Amino acid sequence: MTAECCPNSLRDISHFEAAVRQFRSQYYERDPEMMQALSKGQAPATLIIACSDSRVDTGVLLGAKPGELFTVRNIANLVPPYEQGAGLHGTGAAIEYAVRDVAVDHIIVLGHASCGGIKAVLAAAGGKPIEREFVADWVSMAMDATELYLNPDESGVRHKVSVDLLKENPGLVERASVTGSLHNLLTYPWVKERYDAGKLSLHGWWFDIETGDLWKSDKNDFRLMPAI
């Protein structure tokens, strides 16, 4: 799904240790009251569900301070539909905790351009299987977003928009997938209850890595439109 870099050596991470020292200096030494308060608990107003992609760091992008964001990151920033029963529901568990215990006011689903997960979905739609143990099942949730544009006829040939055209314009599916995740959020009963009561706001965002542009969802139907 991504190209390998430096296959014959492990890349150095010592600069991260230096960054921790800088973080400690910036927050613990200059603003000890804030960190003392955070050591006793958190009360972020926003849950953000973002992609694991290294190029879209939510804290950096939003300029957030410690304690401002409750963050979930997964492949392709997907929200699975609500379901009960056995299983490891990592994303659902984080959403439940953020909504029912932390009581966030906002949920942002943040998609982005050049998403590897969506690229894999488009490849699968074109007949190329995703040869990964866990990724294939996970990103299959985004197939509905693809099928908005790829409409099979009776012979099974996709004809509404070609796969090749979508591969050239993956932002269409990336944004549709964000909209799909917003609708999936409303299948969680405690999300819908607070949303219907006006106590929780849902937002869909899509960030263009190349240009820095931001698209945001319409309040009525969750479709994304250019904003910044």
Which role does the model predict for each range below?
Residues 2-44, 77-105, 116-228:
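Divalent-metal-activated hydrolytic enzyme cores
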Residues 55-78:
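Catalytic core of membrane glycerolipid acyltransferases/transacylases, capturing the structured
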Residues 45-48, 68-70, 105-108:
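Structural motif
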Residues 49-51, 73, 110-112, 203-208:
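Short beta-strand segments
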Residues 53-55, 112-117:
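Gly/Ser/Thr-rich loops at beta-strand to alpha-helix junctions
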Residues 42-59:
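Conserved H-X4-D acyltransferase segment
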